[in-house]
């Protein structure tokens, strides 16, 4: 502990009442102290260089109010400082000195009259009061005793340190000596400056005694901690002391940032405005985190858990765009057609204008691939001003993908629902659950069952992820699920959603989509402009008619991209080209037509009928072929037919045999032949009852020798009583017939209501006939026989078949 000569308490008077001023930052110089300081600021360097060679030079040392000011003015300095003698000056380098100062006495600045070349001021010396009384003696003795006790609890100090206290008899000087040597961690510059400005000796001793008392308490607590003595402490004072001690220890260990991180984490959670129930858990976890060692695995687990809570949008929402016209306009800009979907979103926007507390809808879009189900979600989000996130569920087999893993597992994380909400940053985004029909089930659980709570409006306001184990409100999320077919979706899950069927596009729709969306998109993607490649209307029609046959437009976009690539190659080779995508140019680039009209050529012979089928990819046409051979009346079924379709074929053959007399067929002849019913494309499984009408027409055509008209297709389930019963997928089947060039379609009469969903341009171009019994079918579909087979009806007799 550096000290000065006690006799120097009465310094010699300067020649004048002005002294040069040396600003000091981050410390305070007291009388009775000898300290070295580093000088490197320009003004201070000039002052020191001016004092070189002078003996017993005096300077006024004043502390800065803020250490951040590099060249302070008098306003940035305290008004009270210490007159010091320059004991020694050591040059450390260019413009850098170490100056040893001996504090002599206090002074107050009377006036400042110079800043350059260094600061200088007129000062008033503050004389030290040497009057002693009983109270001052008692205060001095108490300070001396408390300081000895502090020194006794610091075993690393030299043994004679306590003896220095006995050499200083004046209480005021003792207070200055102790204050000057107090560690900065326990006494700030402001605290020490307050002691320096305490001209009254009693007040000064009391301030230092309080400071020593706090340090004494710190050392006592440290001793208690080291000896593991568990005693009850005063909560307020002891907790503060412990935290200060812990902070100092962590700083020494290089772990001082943990408390800052925990405090920052607490502040982030506070800003997230978590519910009261969550806040209670958070407080408990933060308390546990503070007591953990940073190196422990549990520390990182708990910290990650709290960071997830802080990052989730507990209260943050986006403001919906509720203008019906704006929503409708955004949807029309992004998608052609799909009126039913647009109508539902517009209805929701209208209701939100009237009821702001309306929960988000839960919609299920079912339709073939490529019709825009997923992109609809993005368009809906844009139209409503909401964030958009997509969760791909195809192939998901683990329930934890939805509800998360419990924190007991290594590497546990929340499920995809909360991950998507964290990424969105709001609690009311548009969340697309893509391909919900393609989730699987295994020993790890059923993700579809986990979605039951997510998609239930009555339950999802308290959705509980396994990782968080806290309720989270999903009621404001707009859930949009997509699927290709019903088969992979459990009934209870479908029951929780509003189903909207998204059909395939008509030829007119595809032409419009290609013209308005796909062609500009692909030209831009390939770095082309209309000047380099121009798509004509006939060229687009050629791509649609001859190179794609699908419900959606993905294949159409790929073919347009192929045409663009061919031009892009020529441009990249340096050719100055300007091409026009005519039908001839399209064929030159894409090759021979991939889809040809095969209706006429395949239905010119008896025994071939055109049917309509529904698939997850949309509607399709299929051909049912029948032939006969000598035999014993057996029926052979091929073409990868499943049970229901096989039963339909058996029903059709049985009905024809039962009506042999009405069809003018010899029953004995039917016993002498075998029938073979076949559906091409063996590799594709086929099932369903809707091909019954087509099988009946094919078998009757074969036996009567009359071909089925090439422009007619049909669908419908049959019964042994000759009734034609309703089927599903009528809209998709009619769209498939329209794509294939069919101009006449027979459907069950009970499917009349399904025609409301069929686009008007399709109904205008296709003749749709309703049939309710098999008696009506043959006159509508059979051509006159090209040759009358043995034992078959004559051409004149075909007119009588309406009474079958």
From Swiss-Prot:
Keyword ATP-binding in annotation: yes
Keywords: ATP-binding, Cytoplasm, Hydrolase, Nucleotide-binding, Protease, Serine protease, Stress response
Active site: 690, 733
Any coiled-coil regions, as ranges: none
Tree of life domain: Bacteria
SUPFAM superfamilies on file: P-loop containing nucleoside triphosphate hydrolases, PUA domain-like, Ribosomal protein S5 domain 2-like
Disulfide partners: none
GO molecular-function term, one example from the UniProt record: ATP binding
Pfam family, one: AAA
Stretch list, region Disordered: 782-804
Induction entry: By heat shock.
Free-text function comment from the UniProt entry: ATP-dependent serine protease that mediates the selective degradation of mutant and abnormal proteins as well as certain short-lived regulatory proteins. Required for cellular homeostasis and for survival from DNA damage and developmental changes induced by stress. Degrades polypeptides processively to yield small peptide fragments that are 5 to 10 amino acids long. Binds to DNA in a double-stranded, site-specific manner.
HAMAP family: lon_bact
Protein name: Lon protease 2
The encoding gene: lon2
